[in-house]
Structure formats: C-alpha cells, structure tokens
Amino acid sequence: MKALIFNSGTGSRMGTLTANKPKCLLPLPGGETILSRQLRLLSQHGIREAVITTGAYTGLIRQQAKCDRMEITLVENPRYAHTNYIYSMFLAEPTIAGNDLLMLHGDLVFEEQVLTRLLAASGNRCCVDLSAHLPKKDFKGRLRDGCLQEVSVHLFGQDCFALQPLYKLDAAAVHAWCREVSAWIRRGQVQVYAEEALNRIPEQLHIQPLACDGLLLSEVDTPEDYQAVWEVLNPCRN
C-alpha cells in the first residue's frame, strides 16, 4: 500500500501564514510540521512508500519530505496555479497504478486512531463524522445503499454528512478513479476536485463510510482551523 498526498495548492485562504511556505510545512506542537506528522504516522502504520504532489514549493517540500523507513516520490504539477488537484492526481497516476492506496490532502491533521481504524476496516473506505454540523465550504458526502454516492462542497440535506479527504482504496478502485480522472483531463476539465470524477462512477468504487466521530480529523484551510488544531494537539504529541 502506498500513500498519495496532495500538496500542489497555494493555501491562499491562510493569508500570511503561507506567504513563503505551503500549508503542509506549517509547524505543529512537538516540533513537527503537518507533513512530517503525516509521514511519521503513516510510517508507524506500515506505509513504506509515499507519493507527494507539489506545486509552488517543490524545493521546500523536497528538503523536508523525509521519513525513516519510507521511500518518497515527488510529482510536480507545473500548472498548479491554473488547475485543481484532479490534474495532480492525473500526473501521479503512473506512480500509484497497481497499488492499494491511502489518499489524503496535505493539510489534513488526524490522530493516530483514525489510521488504526481505517487500516483495520475492510474494503474501500472514506472518513466521515456523522455527528458534526455540515460545514459551509468543505466536503460533504451522500450515501446510497451504504456506499458513498457523491462528494461535494455544495451538498446539503439530512442525508449528507461531513467528510474529510482521507480514503483507503484497493488497486481496482484506484484504477477506476484514475481512468475517469483521465477522461476529465482529456476534456479539458482541470479546475475541479478529483471527487467530481468519483461522482460519475460511485458504483465502481464501492466506498463505505468509516465513522471517525470524536477523533481529530481536520483540514487546515483557514487560520482559525490552524489555531483549533494547534489547541487540540498541544497537550500531547499523538
């Protein structure tokens, strides 16, 4: 199993915090960054290969993307300023093809128990919080017959739930999703989320929800998100 971590974005909503660095290199309590914490936890749970997509800060990420017992490959998206991570996923496809995959965003902060549950769960999985209020600007998911049917920031309703971009996928699901991503790229649709491709083929992926209610699992999109994560992590390292 490999990990695919998306770090091609500019982090514009973070203001001065990302004026000269990507979000993944923001410091956390204990002397780690978001990225180094992700890599440490992934490595501790047996992930030996990580593919990291990059954009404006390839050099900085290359300097700091280091972890014992883990082989790290960078995939640069030279069109980062004009594309969304659907294009980064397209570029990364040759490095992940044929592998089971953990796919996550580079600004995602999570506690160790999330990985423990995710890796122990059977089948393809997405991470959800069924008890959380639906966020206005972040991902929500919708289920049908117990499987993920749709992911979007625009979903609202009683059948929707908060979803964080952390997926466990087998090689067949990776292949199907990447094939649909390639179709979108061929049509020039490069400014959408990779989940737009997922939404066209949910029946091929069979992704079930994994409830992570009460656990730390949060994207850092704003300074307020960053402060909240810092406060949760400050008392302890894990």
Regions found by a protein language model. Name each.
Residues 61-63, 68-139:
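Conserved beta-loop-beta/alpha segment of the NTase-like Rossmann-fold superfamily
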Residues 2, 48-51, 71, 100, ...:
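Residues at the starts of beta-strands that form the adenosine-phosphate
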Residues 111-188:
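Conserved core of the sugar-phosphate nucleotidyltransferase
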Residues 13, 60-63, 113, 176, ...:
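Phosphate- and divalent-cation-binding pockets in alpha/beta enzyme and binding domains
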Residues 9, 30, 56, 80, ...:
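Short beta->alpha linker loops
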Residues 25, 141-143, 209:
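A structural signal for short hydrophobic beta-strand segments in well-ordered beta-sheet cores
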